[in-house]
Amino acid sequence: MSSILIVPIRPVDHAELAALAEPLEASFHIPVSIEETNYLDPSFALDSYRSQFNSTAIIVKILERFPQFNGKILGITAVDLFVPVLTYVFGEAQLDGTAAVVSTFRLREEFFGLDADPKLESTRLLKEAVHELGHTFGLIHCRNFECVMHSSTSVEEVDLKGIEFCGDCREQLTDSTSR
């Protein structure tokens, strides 16, 4: 049986990690655990020119750190992520692979100069975590704007999409997890 391992990447809010476990179990119907001792320091992935962290490099390091893990690995951090061809990303995943990473950096209201909204920010994090893990199960971006697998290039798009898989994506996920 497969499982999901949540890996803290400094800095990270442990309460956010704990709040993710149960909803992720409900979304994927597999056990979720949180790595309690093997934290990842993302400083190796810092691009000092951009003042951002390369999400692809973080995924590679996650895979190096947990080579024997037989499931999906989700890194969670609060640093600003990028891939070289984009200004920023909320997260990144290996398509039909093992690892993904999500950042809360641009999901927080404070980033936009607004007051914190923990409930909204928690919902955003869950949507992006489910989305990136969906990619690790082989799901691609969905055209259904209500589906959690719909691509989001802004926080407004994260807010607009749903928290669940549409029927087609759920069917693909079920096929993937039953293999």
Each model region followed by its residue ranges:
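A structure-centric signal for secondary-structure junctions around beta-strands
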Residues: M1-S3, N70, D96, I163
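Fold-level signature of zinc-dependent metallopeptidase catalytic domains
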Residues: S2-V12
